[in-house]
Swiss-Prot record:
Glycans are attached at N35, N89, N167. Transmembrane segments: none annotated. It comes from Rattus norvegicus (Rat). GO terms for cellular component: cell surface; cytoplasm; extracellular space; interleukin-12 complex. It is found in: Secreted. Residues 1-22 form the signal peptide. Disulfide bonds join C33-C106, C60-C192, C81-C119. This is Interleukin-12 subunit alpha. It holds the Pfam family IL12. One of its GO terms (biological process) is positive regulation of dendritic cell chemotaxis. Belongs to the IL-6 superfamily. It comes from the Eukaryota. Heterodimer with IL12B; disulfide-linked. This heterodimer is known as interleukin IL-12. Heterodimer with EBI3/IL27B; not disulfide-linked. This heterodimer is known as interleukin IL-35. Interacts with NBR1; this interaction promotes IL-12 secretion.
Amino acid sequence: MCQSRYLLFLATLVLLNHLTSARVIPVSGPAKCLNQSQNLLKTTDDMVRTAREKLKHYSCTAGDIDHEDITRDKTSTLEACLPLELHKNESCLATKETSSIIRGSCLPPQKTSLMMTLCLGSIYEDLKMYQSEFQAINAALQSHNHQQITLDRNMLMAIDELMRSLNHSGETLHQKAPMGEADPYRVKMKLCILLHAFSTRVMTINRVMNYLSSS
């Protein structure tokens, strides 16, 4: 009887140790970045849906707005993040200077390459530009007496979290100057344009993170 209890006690200890070890297994960097990009995709889609509903009189649909890419001629995400077999101007892209040196956890050692480093650096710069624009627009929206719409805090947090994973350099982000007394109609139209452009870019980011986290 005593021996049976002792064996049961040992088995319980082994099980508890196994469960404890399972809890503390850290999520790999690429997997964490994928989770963050998926969260960003969800919160961005939610924000686009909210904008379409609340700004239905502003023609805030993808087919009605004038599409504008604020990252054009400033980053090379679309070129650098192409599959390696499709790269035609790798040497040209490689000579471009990037203002971000990736020190984050999204790039696994087995997939490290010059082009992927450029890709993640460009993604970081994209997020930084959109973050700055969204902060300025949100401040303008909140300053209006009738707060018809403001940016979803969850989306802004998702941008910040992925940026921190992409770059651990401790860079201080500079906020864009407030828009001041901007016309409410123009502010909301700019919000629609930015949201649709950002949604498209987030899809690209999510595909990259899917690739990096795959075995």
